[in-house]
């Protein structure tokens, strides 16, 4: 499972970007793909693991979990 670092995440709008560790292009992340209960958000520079899926607008992180 790929890992990366949260580049930024806007909790009000519910989305942000993850910088993958392999140096590939940043990946869009939507709050609905963050695993867990309650208010789902991410913090800048937080380490995460995720899968990459395709959305109509391009690559999107799915199954995002903090590590």
From Swiss-Prot:
UniProt cross-references to Pfam families, sorted A to Z? CSD (PF00313)
Question: Cellular location of this protein?
Answer: Cytoplasm
Q: Which UniProt keywords are listed?
A: Activator, Cytoplasm, DNA-binding, Isopeptide bond, Transcription, Transcription regulation, Ubl conjugation
Annotated membrane-spanning segments are: none
A single GO molecular-function term is: DNA binding
Family matches, as PROSITE patterns: CSD_1, CSD_2
Can you locate the Isoglutamyl lysine isopeptide (Lys-Gln) (interchain with Q-Cter in protein Pup) cross-link? 47
One Gene Ontology cellular component annotation held by this UniProt entry: cytoplasm
Q: Which residues form the CSD domain?
A: 1-66
Read off the CDD domains from this record: CSP_CDS
InterPro entries, A to Z = Cold_shock_CspA (IPR012156), Cold_shock_domain (IPR050181), CSD (IPR011129), CSD_CS (IPR019844), CSP_DNA-bd (IPR002059), NA-bd_OB-fold (IPR012340)
Q: Which PANTHER family match?
A: COLD SHOCK DOMAIN CONTAINING PROTEINS (PTHR11544)
Q: Protein name, please?
A: Probable cold shock protein A
Underlying gene: cspA
């Amino acid at each position: 499972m790929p890992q990366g670092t949260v580049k930024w995440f806007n909790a009000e709008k519910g989305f942000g970007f993850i910088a993958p560790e392999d140096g590939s292009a940043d990946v869009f992340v939507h709050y609905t793909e963050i695993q867990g209960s309650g208010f789902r958000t991410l913090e800048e520079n937080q380490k995460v693991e995720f899968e990459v899926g395709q959305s109509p607008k391009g690559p999107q992180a799915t199954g995002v979990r903090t590590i």
